Amino acid sequence: MAPAVQAQEAPVSVNIPAQPLGDALLQLGSQTSLQIFYSQDVLAGQNARAISGNLSPEEALRQLLQGTGIQYTRNGNNVTLSRANPTGGTVQLEAVTVTAGILGNLAEPYAGGQVATGGSLGLLGSEDVMDTPFSTVNYTSELLYDQQARTLADVVVNDASVRNLTSSGGFGEDFQIRGFAVGSGDVSVNGLYGLVSSSRVPVQILERVEVLKGPGAFMRGIPPNGSIGGAINVVTKRADDDPLARVTLGYASKANITGQIDLGQRFGEDNAWGVRFNGVKRGGESTLRDGKQGLDMGALGIDYRGTRLRWSADAIHQEDVIENFRSQIGWQPTVTALPAPPDGDINFYPGTRLSQRDSTIMSRLEYDFTDNLTGHIAAGYREGKVRQIFPVTVNPAGVRQSVDQDGNFNVMTTYYDSYSKTSSGDAGLTARFNTGSVKHRVALGANYLNQEAGNAYSTGSAIVASNIYDPTPIPDGPSVRLTPQKASDTTLTSFALADTLSFAEDRILLTAGVRHQRVQVDSYNTTTGARTSGYRASANSPIGGIVVKPLHNVSVYANFAQGLTRGTIVGDTYENRGAVLAPYKSKQYETGVKVDWDGNITTTLALFQIARPSGQADDNNVYGYFGEQRNRGLELTGYGEITRGLRLMASAAYINSELTKTPGGVSQGNRPAGVPASTYNLGLDWDTPWVQGLSLNGRAIRTSSVYLNNTNTLRLPGYTRFDLGARYATTIAGKDVVFRANVENVADKKYWLASGSFVTNAAGRTYMLSASINY
């Protein structure tokens, strides 16, 4: 051992069972303020004995490492592990991993490297998946690279409980988690809402993608659009200890070229300062006929990691331009059977255009006041602008009308432009202390979001007839394009308190908390600027969870959580027009069991029920929350490394979804629109034994049929998609090079995707090639 000299430390209560050393170090990080850095191969095959008692953090570390031959050096709360060298000294670290011990750190990758051992849960901090009473999955940058993911949608589809409601090349991306919609506007970045593009999130800025299944309002506050099925948080890149200079060139069909640079460097004493820059230039033909898609993106991340102080800042700018984007269509009420989907490269409305610009800045500061008290504050600001040449289906007289049974429709052109300005903040304190034999982790937090949004809608007069199989270019748009004016102003604030109690040597973990939410919404006339309506409301969102570990590798868990969605202002077509409905709550009950099979495979079985009020009119045409959508489900997941070099990601979800408490029994017991009864995923990634550096991968995605309406008279067929890929890692002229090739929708399957009552044709067979060079 070669520790640096430290000041006398106060002992803390430590209870860590015998288990693999990596898991034991994660628990040590969560019970103390130590940040532990190490290379993956340092811990290979190492196990830790059980330790307990009132120990200083360093003494606890010594006991865990006893007999392993692993050395450590310490600077403040930063600890670096290394293997002893037979000739003396230590072995240099190759790839550094950080335990998820305190705020701001990333959990180490799990076996196989595609997912992480834990992730952030907002107010509850960073937790190992085996220690949290929720169902989560945390994707690593390795997976993003190897699958050649382009946007966030390409990542989250790896889990059967998550489905994309839109296809690539559209005007935006929306998701579904546990049968409920989650929009791109409800994705958080580094724990803050409202700071990523409301249309699509490019993966080039991402280090991790963290998915929570089930309502997440307690963790980070109300999402801007009130999603309740789950929560998605993305984590931006930071510089590693090893310098990085990577250039990637990519190609995607039909002829879309991407160039990316990824630079990272740490410097200063103990590599305390880090800088990470990513730049992307993309352009060329998209997967749609006569389509073009471009992206210009730059992202700069700076961070400082000191003994007690940690700070980070990000600046992100992206500009997207899509000529002929993939659109959605609706169906006339008389349609009882959908026509066959057209080819995947057909755009229903030739001549559409989308341009989008987003700029974001954000910063986060964390400080350890003592070994057992940490505070943080984070803030960010985003401006977004969107300009669209947008089609509208009408009848020959110009009145709104959808597509008929044979795919015929009439279309006029509109301009729909919008802007948004968002300020977002988060602050909190986390304290650790004991009451007798019970350990507490108490978190106090506050969240704030203000979002101003504006729009302008200009309608043309020319109308042309068209068909989904042989679309006609949309006509000329209006002669005047209006400037977007303020339409709404939303402020969401909340205060939360939570306590996680540990009993019986951390074999029982109990979490309880409550968040008080305040909602303020004002609407404005975009012509006069006058305030037309508004409301103020508040509500409390409690949470409860328990984890019981009968064995060190088995976690039995249960939770109760609530989602909260801001209320709506009743429209003019109802008897109670102008009435303000209170924010409504969605309730989840969940239980499950997680098993970590010798650190190689983790499996999860989860049972859940989510009930959400449904807004509709009663027999007197009074609008309110009179019905309920209830989703009851079973989830099975497994991920990790089956054998050395064979990686697995498999999952299945079964949802019994029905409408209950409906006014007058209308549609009572029916299946809600857009919710599949079953979904399946199977992904394998294999390092071939006959060619060093060559890996093959494949993925199957199955989604059952769904209804397009609550009356269950119009059904959308299910689909199965197959993807294949390969990569080859080698060295050329002393430089590490990785070649990748992927094919999505290998069979060129034609199928519909549904988002609410609208559908779009899925992208056809798509080829992707890339080469990455590390200088």
Give the ranges of each region predicted by the language model.
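Acidic, small-polar-rich N-terminal luminal/periplasmic segments of exported/outer-membrane proteins
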Residues: 30, 35, 94-242, 591
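Outer-membrane beta-barrel translocator/receptor signature
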Residues: 204-207, 217-298, 304-310, 359, ...
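Acidic/polar loop-and-plug regions of large Gram-negative outer-membrane beta-barrel proteins
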Residues: 282-286, 299-366, 383-420, 463-492
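Structural signature of Gram-negative outer-membrane beta-barrels, strongest in the C-terminal barrel
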Residues: 303, 420, 439-451, 486-612, ...
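Surface-exposed extracellular loop regions of Gram-negative outer-membrane beta-barrel proteins
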Residues: 321-333, 450-455, 547-590, 602-625, ...
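Membrane-embedded beta-barrel scaffold of Gram-negative outer-membrane proteins
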Residues: 366-368, 374-380, 384-392, 557, ...
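Conserved C-terminal beta-signal and adjacent last beta-strands/turns
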Residues: 442, 558, 589, 673-775
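Gram-negative outer-membrane beta-barrel transporters
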Residues: 609-611, 625-710
